[in-house]
Amino acid sequence: MSNATNNTLGSLLPQLEAAANSNSLYGGMVPNLRFNITMIVIWGILLTIHVVQLLMRQYWFSIAFICTGILEVLGFIGRTWSHSNVADMDAFLLNMICLTIAPVFTMGGIYYQLAKLIEVYGHRFSLLPSPMAYSFIFICSDIVSLVVQAVGGGLCGVAVTDGTSTTTGNHVFIAGLAIQVASMAIFLMLWFHFLFRIYISVRWEHINSRPISLSLLKISQTEVDYLYREKFHFLRLEPKRWVFHYFNLAITVAVLTIFTRCCYRLAELVVGWDGYLITHEWYFIILDALMMAIATVTLTIFHPGFAFKGKSTSIPITPGHVDPETLPHTDDVEDILDTSDSKQFDIEKEEFQASMKYPISTFKQFMSKIANLFSSKKKAKL
């Protein structure tokens, strides 16, 4: 009798849980408390590290990471909050919007690094008319993606508050993610083209032949360095500078993991709020949380501030397909070639602040809208 009773209770438990979570915004799934608290701690540590790196190295790329870190912490706070109440819309929106938008800022920072690398290796390796074109095109694309996603999230929030359908907001959100995925796919093609040029094409140029063979790998970077831009040879050749030597690999890992994560998020939203992906947390853990953690830890270790020697070396982004020092010396060119730390550091700061002006402004407006949304909902409840 006891065994029969236990078996009956055991078979009823899943049904009771499903009934209890029938109003779950996660399709019946309850976010794992331990995992989400762990992620809050991990992202809190990463956020602190990047604040310290910004203060110590004064490399402005950390601003992009800091925005990502804030959004990730808020997103996992939302998931932790949802554990105790899976029907709470405030917690769900905090999780969904913050975690979905967070990678936009990391990618904005990464786009800027390709322009830097083209400056280090030489303008002739740029497929676009100018190194800055990479930053301009893809950061603008990120801004569009961020704005569209923010509008979609806002429409969803308003629809929930009014008790109307969130279909329009969902479609707008999906469009924003689709723009981001398409932009990243194009960037990946340009990134691998750049890697092909600096690792394969230069070796072909060095041996004056075009064999497709693993023997090319036997040619060291030192042997072909004369084919790169001479001005920054000290960044490339110093033996102990392992951070720079593996920096391109780190960028590749970061972009591929974030791209994987964005494809997952797009598929999740397309399938729907009660679809298979959103109702099975392991997909989120592996394809979202783990991917973002790998990308951020990788770029924390191989931080651009270390790879490019932080504030001790400035790499101004200059226009054109030709390295500035090869042009006839005019006043404008002399300004570009002036490598005094104070002057070039100011240029570096201004360049990055200009490129991140609109993403940061949008980030502030977005956080303000989230705060206003939650505030208005609480007032309505009262």
Swiss-Prot record:
Give GO BP annotations, semicolon-separated.
lipid transport
Where, subcellularly, is it found?
Cell membrane
Residue ranges in the Extracellular topological domain are: 1-34, 79-90, 157-171, 263-281
User: Which Pfam families does this entry report, sorted A to Z?
Assistant: RTA1
Glycan attachment positions? 3, 6
Q: List keywords of the entry alphabetically.
A: Cell membrane, Glycoprotein, Lipid transport, Membrane, Transmembrane, Transmembrane helix, Transport
The answer to whether keyword Cell membrane applies is: yes
Q: How does it sit in the membrane?
A: Multi-pass membrane protein
Residues that span the membrane, as ranges: 35-55, 58-78, 91-111, 136-156, 172-192, 242-262, 282-302
Topological domains on the Cytoplasmic side lie at: 56-57, 112-135, 193-241, 303-382
Task: Give the induction text.
Answer: In response to loss of mitochondrial DNA in a transcription factor PDR3-dependent manner. Induced in response to altered glycerophospholipid asymmetry of the plasma membrane in a transcription factor PDR1-dependent manner.
InterPro entries, from UniProt? RTA1 (IPR007568)
Quote the cellular component terms of the Gene Ontology held in the record: fungal-type vacuole; plasma membrane
Q: What does this protein do?
A: Catalyzes the ATP-dependent translocation of sphingoid long-chain bases (LCBs) from the cytoplasmic site toward the extracytoplasmic side of the membrane (flip-flop). Involved in the establishment of the functional lipid asymmetry of the plasma membrane. Regulates intracellular levels of LCBs, sphingolipid precursors that are growth inhibitory at increased levels.
Q: Which family does it belong to?
A: Belongs to the lipid-translocating exporter (LTE) (TC 9.A.26.1) family.
The protein depicted here goes by the name: Sphingoid long-chain base transporter RSB1
Q: Which organism is it from?
A: Saccharomyces cerevisiae (strain JAY291)
What gene is this protein a product of? RSB1
